[in-house]
Regions:
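Conserved C-terminal guanine-recognition region of P-loop GTPase G domains, centered on the G4
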Residues: 78-125
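Conserved G1/Walker A P-loop phosphate-binding module
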Residues: 1-32, 41-48
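Inter-motif core of Ras-like GTPase G domains
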Residues: 58-80, 91-95
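Loop/turn-to-beta-strand initiation segments
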Residues: 45-48, 70-71, 100-101
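Structural motif
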Residues: 7-9, 52-53, 76-79, 106-109, ...
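Switch II (G3) loop of P-loop NTPases
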Residues: 44-60
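Canonical P-loop GTPase G-domain recognition
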Residues: 111-159
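Structural motif corresponding to alpha-helix initiation and N-cap regions
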Residues: 58-59, 86, 142
């Protein structure tokens, strides 16, 4: 069973991405981690997804949850500078060297994404703004979710 920790700055689109996953099932917590209330967690196609916000991921108390991840899905707002995720990326890299990180640049304006290819990032996927449900919720386009799931599988197989 592979665990994918979805993390990133507040408001970057982590919950939107998890909400948009197809065929969601029940989350099975990894063994030997402390109990934690997760904002979002589910299984999808053999992957266990769980969301941990940036402030929690930067802390030391929940390090077991970082170590349980077989891959990181770092969601960033494309309107922000890549520097906005560098402290979190450094924390993930120091806590879990060798764990692949897929950076998803959300709300992508359609330009080149070379600037987002940061040290410690195995791959970058742009993500369009998606469909707005209401003022607080949106959904990612299904074909983009499929592309992200395929890229995650590739990274996990290569690890």
């Amino acid at each position: 069973m592979n665990y994918v920790m979805v993390t990133g700055p507040m408001g970057a689109g982590k919950s939107t991405l998890i909400r948009s996953l197809p065929e969601k099932g029940v989350f099975a917590p990894p063994p030997d981690v402390p109990e934690m209330f997760l904002d979002n967690a589910c299984s999808c196609r053999g992957l266990q997804f769980y969301e941990i916000d940036e402030p929690t991921a930067l802390g030391r108390h929940w390090a077991g949850w970082l170590g349980a991840a077989n891959a990181f899905l770092l969601v960033a707002d494309a309107g922000a500078s890549p520097a906005a995720v560098e402290p979190l990326l450094a924390r993930l890299g120091s806590a879990c060297p060798g764990t692949p990180c897929l950076l998803v640049a959300n709300r992508w304006p359609g330009s080149r994404h070379d600037a987002w290819q940061l040290p410690g990032v195995a791959a970058v996927e742009p993500l369009s703004p998606g469909a707005v449900l209401d003022e607080e919720r949106a959904l990612v386009q299904p074909e983009e979710v499929e592309r992200i799931l395929a890229r995650l599988q590739q990274l996990l197989e290569a690890a």
